[in-house]
From Swiss-Prot:
Domain named Helicase ATP-binding: residues: 23-203
Name recorded for this polypeptide: Dicer-like protein 2
Organism: Aspergillus terreus (strain NIH 2624 / FGSC A1156)
PROSITE patterns membership: DICER_DSRBF, HELICASE_ATP_BIND_1, HELICASE_CTER, RNASE_3_1, RNASE_3_2
Keywords, alphabetical: Antiviral defense, Antiviral protein, ATP-binding, Helicase, Hydrolase, Magnesium, Manganese, Metal-binding, Nucleotide-binding, Repeat, RNA-binding
Residues the record marks as site: Important for activity: K1256
Amino acid sequence: MASLSDQDLEMGLFCPRNYQTEMFEASLQENIIVAMDTGSGKTHVALLRIMNELETRRPQKLIWFLAPTVALCFQQHDVITKNLPAVKSRTLTGQDKVELWTEQAIWDAILKDMQVVVSTHAVLADAMSNGFVRVSQLGLLIFDEAHHCMRRHPANRIMQDFYHPTLVKQGPDAVPGILGLTASPVVRTNSQELSMIESNMNAICKTPRAHRQELLTHTHRPHLQQIWYTPVNIDDPTSGTRTLRALIHAWETIDLEDDPYVKQLRRSTFDGKALQKALLTRKTYCNESLRRFVERSCHIFQELGGWAVDYFIHASIRRLREKIDDSALMLDWDNEEKEYLASFLSNIATIQSDPPRRPEDFIPSPKLEALISFLSSTDDSTFSGLIFAKQRATVTVLATLLSVHPLTKDRFRCAAFVGWSGGGNRKDLIGELLSMQMQRDTLSEFRSGQKNLIVATDVLEEGIDISACSVVICYDKPANVKSFVQRRGRARRKESTFAILFSTDDELCDLRKWQLLEEAMIEAYQDDERKRCEALALETMAEVVTERFEVESTGAVLTADTAVARLHHFCSILPQQPYVDNRPELSFEYDGTGRRRGTFKLPSCVHPDVRRTRGEKWWTTERAATKEAAFQTCKRLYEFGLLNDHLLPLTRKPELRLTDFGGLPSIIEVAEQYDPWTDWAYSWSSPDIHQSRIRVQLNGNPEYQLSMSLMGPTVLPALDAMTLFWDSQNIFTLAFDAAQRVPLVPGDVIEHMRAITALYLQAPSSRSIREERDYVALFGPDLPHTELGAWLLKNGGNDTALDVYSRQVASPTMGIVRDRTRYDEPLLFKKWVVTEDGDVAVVEMECHSLPKRRNLLQRQTLAQGEIVTTAVDTAPAKARIIPATACTIDRLPFTDTIFGLFISAILDRLEATLIATRLCETILQDVQFSSTRHVITAISAPTAQSPTDYQRYEFFGDSVLKFTVSCQLYMQHPNWPEGYLSEGRDEIVQNNRLARAALDVGLDAFILTRRFTPRKWTAPLISEKAVEVAGKRPLSSKVLADVVESLIGAAYMDGGQAKAHTCIRRLLPEIEICPITPPPVHESAPHVMNDSLKQHLGYTFVNEALLVEALTHPSCRSDASTQSYQRLEFLGDAVLDMVVVHAMAHHAVECPQGEMTMIKHALTNANLLAFFCMEFVVAQEHTDVDAVPAAGGFALRSEQKPIELWRFMRSEALDLNNARETVLHRHSQLRAEIVHALHHGAQYPWQALSQLNADKFFSDIVESILGAIFVDSRGDLDVCAMFVERIGLLPYLRRILADRVDVMHPRHTAQRLSKGEALFTAKRVVDGSGNASYRCVVKRNKEEIVVVEGCLSSEEAEVKAANATIGILRANAVNLV
């Protein structure tokens, strides 16, 4: 058959051609025998039919693939497993000892859950004969090399003994479908033979008709060349070498009485007749073996010459000795027979030593000389050839001879191939030089180019997948027409040669037969060429296609003449994918009059509703049919919404934008930050006074607690507790009680509060505060209003230090010490220092300076501080001795005084709370935030240096917005392919749009950008705020966009997805939150689905068609009803982000935004997802049969074999299969390292994953399955998280967070260590052989410090270079220390 075509191998595309699809579709209508030339890709037809049978027809039935040889069975099974890796399949051949499986239980166990079996015809015929396999079990029978189904061949026995009787008795539903594959349906020249094969197989022989011209373009006819030689007369007594003549003489004069079998009969008294027969016929085991050996030796001399026969004889004797030493190779021979043969042949071998290899010793036969002469005329640079010989011995010796002959050894890399069956027969023990092991890698080496010439028996005529050859030589004439056609088909490279060696002694009639065959072949070529020329001439006919379509709104016109170009333009801008051809496919169908109608099939990323469009009319020329079909296709694309009103694709066009947002500069003028104190200033004119208690605590110590009061002219918002950092070890906590309305506050109380507020503001400062006391917010002790006056009299003002000393005031109740010589600098009292100066006591004070830092909202790393409490030790190093006469001491105790330092921080946070409250009551009223805490964080720009800023919430909001928009576009635009969805999302979530949204709703006024600077801070006054006019401020448009995302993130943190969606709707009204509704459930989802896979996913699909779509690669174009996974992968990407972000947001470890970004980047890294895809396996039971020698029988062995997730992906690209195998090989080498890093490593395995360099489809199917689960579950993220948990991603996330795994990319680490001086340059380089690799150079200060070469990707090169750089930088740092 059935090899894959060379063009397919070159292009790497499994995508079926039109003529292959024609044959596949024909096979669905009736039983057919596909007759196409060797190399035309009949395998594709079989693969399509197998897939269709498993998906849509009778998936519970068994598919049996029959091939004539064991080698071909293994090859076809390999093709099936590579292209349909999820299908459970196996081979059954003589190597499995199936002839000894004599129990039904063995067969039942072997075939249990099996979907495809590949075997020789004899295996199935014998199994059916013994009743182990029944016709009713089979859904499809595929006959490779179907021309064998004749006479008593096992293929015909299957049909005649089982298929046809069942068909007659039970009808067509009781028998399997039949698909035959052949390049030569006629074996002989009998005209009735084709009809006989069709009758035997109950099938019609078909060849492509509608797309025959395409078939001809993919098949190449070789030039037939005759090579003449004069044969050797072996009967001439002088002919032959001394060794050959000695062998012939020895055998002819052999004394049969020495034969072990005759000796055995002589010793027996019951075998007289047997002895008589043996002596008369001379047929014993040993003598018959020697006879065949002599015949082969003579044949080799005649065919190849003297050196060849000497080599054959000596090599055979050496091989015999090896077999005797290895008793396992001669189980059927007793020791006496072995010794007899060895002794007989060894005596002959003494005549002459091994044949020499000097040039003059190579005396070829005339036939070999003709062959070598022909080979010498071939082109060395492109040579790839096959030589067919009849006998196995000839094959082995000829390959050896060409490998050592002076004229050929340097030009050809030879190997022999005789197949994998027959070599173990006991009658061939002498003279059988080629073992299975010796030819195991022959074909693969030929495909790879390591060998360029194979000498083979007719085993390579049929089916075996070998590369297209430039030369095919028949060393012996083909036995029949079938062999002639099959061998000729091997020479399918362009300008190839098919040569046959002819003896000058051939009779004229024999020669005439081949001349007639050649003439018939040439006539067939000429007939095909004539038809092709007629078709080309027909295309010159003028046929007018008048179709026209106009878009009224724009005047854009579509005509048949422009449609083809528009269609190709549409396909060209679809997202490019590896292994995928986005060009539209054109096919034709014909009516009874020879007219045709075109059909265009678009790439699988296009919605199935418009993927296939058929022309509406029949045409004489292909050109006209093409135009009209393209016109209908473009018109449907427009009606489906994939072309705009200008009849252009939507990508990068305004149609993907829901609104035109216009551009914004990077820095824009926006409203000044909203000032809530202005509203409070006006409120004092008619106050509704509210008051809140402030409870101050130090280090959580209940012994130090201060109660204060905050008063305002209107309702006070709920304030969150505040943490103020006095120093590195002392922390104040401020808690705010719920505000209470205070009715009828007298004016003197207000004045007392203003005076007390001024007292607190002045207390810790050396500067005099302003005389104005009309503060918008008032502070005082937590006392009844009636006691405020007395409190003020008691605590206001100061005393001289000497007066305080004389009253012996206790230290804890003392106030701030002020040094009048230094502008009333406030000091912290430590102790009195009294000295004697004569009779006069000199009183001095030991004091400490107050801490210089005033921004207590920010945590700082400071030395141990001082707080005036009994628990705080002294610090002599900071002591200052000051004369008491130069100081005053405030009456307000220091424990109250420090509250004055808290007022600026309290009002800063109160201002932020008031702004957030106003925002929640106006713009974000519908969101219904539970508190202002999240909102304050969301509107605080990093430049404000507030206790919290929006960066963390912006990270959350970015993922929530991306996720929400992805869901909206996916649901709203089922007609959009993934490229449109991606670009549509980018248009909505771009910073420009988000910044415009912030301006549209007035969000700019609520963004906190002013930095809190306590040293420059002044208490807000009514008189000033009442006259202020709001201005403008410059602000980055990115900050506007970030705040939009951070508010979405805040809503998400406050109330989950529902509240986040409400916030999105308010800020971005064009985004409609669509419910996630899966498509209607189809009756059956066409896919080879494994029940274990469904269970292992952790989710039961309501609509399995979604899972099928999730597993359909874009290269899979044969299934016109299923879209490729790209749309689901687009959605799954957003879902994965959301699952990861949700896990981080709700984890006990709270990470900063920068670290979360790195973690998310690491977790959603395509190589990591690909690794998890390769590790995600489904256990499947596999049963095999083991021989039990002791019991003389067989035992069934069952084991669980893993089936990886990637095996279920549907693809039609040969290059993809090859790339997949390469990646899996790297996976096997890197797996242990990556697994260890994921479970135990302190660092993320960047280098190992970059070396894995997995193709994107591995990670794509993880995301597409996640998208399918999300849609099928109607948007249930918890269910999606379960799948992410099962593949191993969430457990690794938890380990990263818990163990603080370093996920920073090595390049960033290198940049950090080098302080940004490391310059990385990665380039793709191509060597002299055309092999590409990546090279990375790292320079520091213009000096190369690292060079990495030979990498598979730029990522691998950069990671390796970065790690090397890190090692150098750290080593240098250690050396400097």
